[in-house]
């Protein structure tokens, strides 16, 4: 049913709940994964794939660690680092890859950002026809 799952990661502790859910689902469904992080700092937004910054180096290392975790569990995963607006890049990747499911973690609300821009989850869910798995991050 879910042959290819796009797993959106933001590099925060909120990712852990999503990773654990996706591990179970991917094993049961024998899914392949694409682990996506959207770098949205100033360097990423201005220079895109040409950006060189500590943020992008850390993002790539994080994606590789998560990839190794999934691969170690017998789940094929590849990584993709995108640059710019998270909702836009998530939607573009999901459509280009023809994903069967988009998996995202919710962190709750960031008042001012949500008021002015809307949350990433809200924007994605209103604009995609691809099924979504939304996992609420556990409070620490």
Residue ranges, per PLM feature:
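Structural beta-alpha unit
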Residues: 68-102, 139-140
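Short, hinge-like loop/turn segments at secondary-structure boundaries
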Residues: 51-54, 96-98, 120-122
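Small/aliphatic-rich secondary-structure junction motif
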Residues: 3-49
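Short, surface-exposed alpha-helical segments at coil->helix boundaries
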Residues: 52-64
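Short secondary-structure boundary segments
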Residues: 37-38, 105-107, 136-137
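Intrinsically disordered or low-complexity boundary/linker segments at protein termini
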Residues: 1-17, 126-140
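Glycine-rich, Arg-bearing micro-motifs that act as flexible, cationic patches
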Residues: 105-126
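General small-molecule cofactor/ligand-binding pocket signal
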Residues: 36, 78-82, 133
